[in-house]
């Protein structure tokens, strides 16, 4: 399948038509994924290097100025803490270390400080890096590029028409301008969406094709995590099946992109998480910004149970041997009261 051949009408039908068999859809998306990425899954870890204290009014975000979510707010972590956590991420087999800082965007002084930290991480730790720090211009992006930053994240989050319903302190064009600034500075782009914020099928399709237009190589698909205190709490749009259809849509429209299962994976995909690895080839470990997530061990198990492999896999996979086979031991605490186990002397 070429990137130019998936029509928008088919994309809309894919999301809305219950007669399109879900497993057949997942299998077809899996064929596209296998063509470009094989069976490898890239692991990313988020480090929320500054939490809260944000002047923006994004309705979905626990860090925004209008949220009453009970989060722990803190200023930028120390340089040594950020670097130490990069070492820890690498030791766990993480492919890319993603630093996220709250706020509208960094000052010139903050940009230089972040560049210094990135330079140390690249020189001392040797891990792929991504930074999400809000709105930026070309000069700021160029400073980060010179420091060795591999990728800049700035999510579109939703379509241009739906953006005013989500946030009023910045525009959709502001976000596009940040992506353009990053690209002009030579940085790889990372940009995706949040599903479940009251958007229509057309909104989702619009985002998928907008990211295709900009040839974004890394696309995180987040599913709204309903955090009490946020204005956009729960639109009751998402089911495991719909989440899978959204992931398949993005794979068909952006066949060569790294499609990442982002926030909300555990709660919205639930028992269908393994199926999501057919359209997607990347996911986060150990949580997101304001919420916890599956541990590295749980993610490794999920990937291996589904028949995939971790990109750049380390010796961590050796730990799976002890849990790869199900065994029922003689511990009475896990037995049904009607079940007895007899042991022969032979």
UniProtKB/Swiss-Prot annotation:
Its EC number is 2.8.1.6. It catalyses: (4R,5S)-dethiobiotin + (sulfur carrier)-SH + 2 reduced [2Fe-2S]-[ferredoxin] + 2 S-adenosyl-L-methionine = (sulfur carrier)-H + biotin + 2 5'-deoxyadenosine + 2 L-methionine + 2 oxidized [2Fe-2S]-[ferredoxin]. [4Fe-4S] cluster binds at residues 54, 58, 61. Its cofactor is [4Fe-4S] cluster; [2Fe-2S] cluster. [2Fe-2S] cluster binds at residues 98, 130, 190, 260. Catalyzes the conversion of dethiobiotin (DTB) to biotin by the insertion of a sulfur atom into dethiobiotin via a radical-based mechanism. GO terms for molecular function: 2 iron, 2 sulfur cluster binding; 4 iron, 4 sulfur cluster binding; biotin synthase activity; iron ion binding. Belongs to the radical SAM superfamily. Biotin synthase family. This is Biotin synthase.
């Amino acid at each position: 399948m070429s990137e130019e051949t998936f029509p928008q009408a088919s994309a809309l039908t894919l999301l809305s038509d219950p007669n399109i068999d879900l497993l057949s859809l997942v299998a077809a998306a899996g064929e596209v994924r296998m063509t470009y990425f094989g069976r490898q899954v890239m692991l990313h870890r988020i480090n929320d290097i500054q939490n809260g204290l944000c002047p923006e009014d994004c309705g979905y975000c626990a860090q925004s100025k209008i949220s009453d979510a009970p989060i722990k707010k803190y200023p930028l972590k120390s340089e040594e803490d950020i670097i130490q956590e990069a070492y820890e991420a690498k030791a766990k087999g993480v492919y890319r270390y993603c630093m996220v800082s709250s706020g509208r965007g960094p000052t010139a002084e903050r940009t230089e400080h972040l560049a210094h930290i990135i330079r140390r991480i690249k020189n001392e730790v040797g891990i792929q890096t991504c930074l999400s720090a809000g709105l930026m211009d070309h000069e700021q992006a160029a400073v980060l590029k010179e420091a060795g930053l591999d990728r800049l994240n700035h999510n579109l989050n939703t379509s241009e028409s739906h953006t005013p319903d989500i946030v009023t302190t910045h525009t959709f064009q502001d976000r596009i301008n940040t992506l353009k600034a990053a690209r002009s500075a030579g940085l790889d782009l990372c940009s995706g969406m949040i599903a479940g914020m009251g958007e229509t099928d057309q909104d989702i399709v619009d985002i998928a094709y907008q990211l295709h237009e900009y040839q974004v190589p890394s696309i995180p698909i987040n599913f709204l995590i309903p955090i009490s205190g946020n204005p956009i709490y729960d639109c009751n749009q998402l089911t495991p099946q719909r989440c899978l259809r959204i992931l398949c849509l993005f794979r068909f429209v952006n066949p060569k992109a790294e499609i990442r299962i982002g926030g909300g994976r555990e709660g919205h995909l639930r028992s269908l998480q393994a199926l999501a690895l057919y359209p997607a080839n990347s996911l986060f470990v150990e949580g997101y910004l304001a919420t916890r997530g599956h541990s590295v061990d749980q993610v490794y198990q999920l990937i291996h149970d589904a028949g995939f492999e971790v990109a750049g896999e380390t010796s961590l996979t050796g730990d799976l041997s002890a849990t790869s086979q199900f065994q029922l031991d003689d511990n009475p605490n896990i037995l049904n009261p009607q079940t007895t186990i007899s042991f022969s002397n032979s």
